[in-house]
Amino acid sequence: CIALTPAQLGAARWPAGAPGLSCVSEEDALPFADLSFDRILLVHGLESAESARRMLREVWRVLKDDGRVLVIAPNRTGMWAYRESTPFGNGHPYSIRQLDRLLAAGLFRAERRDAALWMPPTRMRLVLRAAPLLERAGRRLVPGLSGVTIVEAVKDVYAAMPVRAVARRRLVLAEAG
């Protein structure tokens, strides 16, 4: 287990009190060799990235050819994305479609989608005790209002590589006269 923290935040020991490695890195220059990992768990990564596309290209680079990435990002329509006192309230929230497009642009193929965290952002004990009930009810009654969107994607090694469009000259003929 390796915990990677953005360079601007500094190192954070994770998991706390358990063996693991922790390091800091720029989001678009991961300190790992190509094809290093089978799985990457990307939590609180995309919403605070300066360039989510560049970050995903780096994730693609360090994943093995059959590698998978699990992205957990704030849901654009969820309550948590609008509370600045939560980790989800800072940064860019995403809808499922936005994540699908972003992953496809990063040469990933989304395979599974899910949602979680219908519990409202509160510290009230009564509401906290009702969390399991609220999670079940939220999943059934208001599935679009979850706090986070979860997408599991596989590295798409056969995807077409995007190339820049070649500028073409257009010949315009004017009438003589």
Say what each PLM segment does.
Residues 136-141, 145-177:
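C-terminal lobe and adjacent flexible extensions of AdoMet/dcAdoMet transferase-like proteins
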Residues 89-113, 117:
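Short alpha-helix
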Residues 111-136, 144-146:
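Conserved catalytic loop of SAM-dependent methyltransferase domains
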